[in-house]
């Protein structure tokens, strides 16, 4: 990735990926903590992906939290519904696993699983 303003472009790629996988909504990205630099092989970053309708009205029921980090040299994305802490969490590393948010054990995917799995795949493509 070759950007002049890397942080802004990186956030834009995440937002556009969410726009694509969660149509017809529009998304913005707010960094919560961590860093990711173009030339750095390490990543540890948490962002919120905020959702709006086409008229700009916030739709917080669709907001997401995205964590990106390396585990054993492999990129891992963890995606959860920001305002629904009891919903399953997507772990997308070498394998894709849905986890119960209360106990961390593997669980069945929710009905909206394909959207979040597609989002994770698109973001991984941009990063790797």
Question: Which residue stretches match the model-derived regions?
Answer:
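Intrinsic-disorder/low-complexity coil detector
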Residues: 23, 84-87, 109
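Aromatic- and glycine-enriched beta-alpha-beta binding-site module
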Residues: 54-94, 98
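Negatively charged, low-complexity tracts enriched in Asp/Glu with abundant Ser/Thr
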Residues: 1-63
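N-terminal soluble domains immediately following signal/targeting peptides that reside
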Residues: 43, 48, 69-70, 111-115
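A generic alpha-helix propensity feature with a strong bias for hydrophobic helices
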Residues: 27, 88-91, 112-113
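Low-complexity, intrinsically disordered/propeptide-like segments
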Residues: 16, 29, 71, 119-122
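Ampiphathic alpha-helical segments that act as solvent-exposed interaction surfaces
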Residues: 94-128
């Amino acid at each position: 990735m070759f950007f002049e303003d890397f942080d802004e472009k990186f956030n834009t790629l995440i937002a556009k990926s969410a726009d694509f996988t969660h149509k017809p909504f529009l998304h913005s990205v707010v960094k919560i903590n961590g860093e990711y630099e173009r030339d750095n092989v390490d990543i540890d970053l948490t962002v919120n992906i905020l959702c709006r309708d086409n008229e700009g009205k916030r739709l917080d029921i669709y907001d997401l939290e995205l964590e990106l980090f390396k585990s054993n040299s492999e990129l891992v994305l963890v995606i959860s519904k920001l305002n629904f802490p009891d919903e399953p969490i997507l772990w997308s590393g070498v394998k894709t696993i849905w986890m119960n948010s209360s106990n961390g054990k593997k669980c069945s995917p929710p009905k909206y699983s394909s959207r979040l799995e597609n989002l994770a795949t698109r973001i991984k493509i941009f990063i790797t």
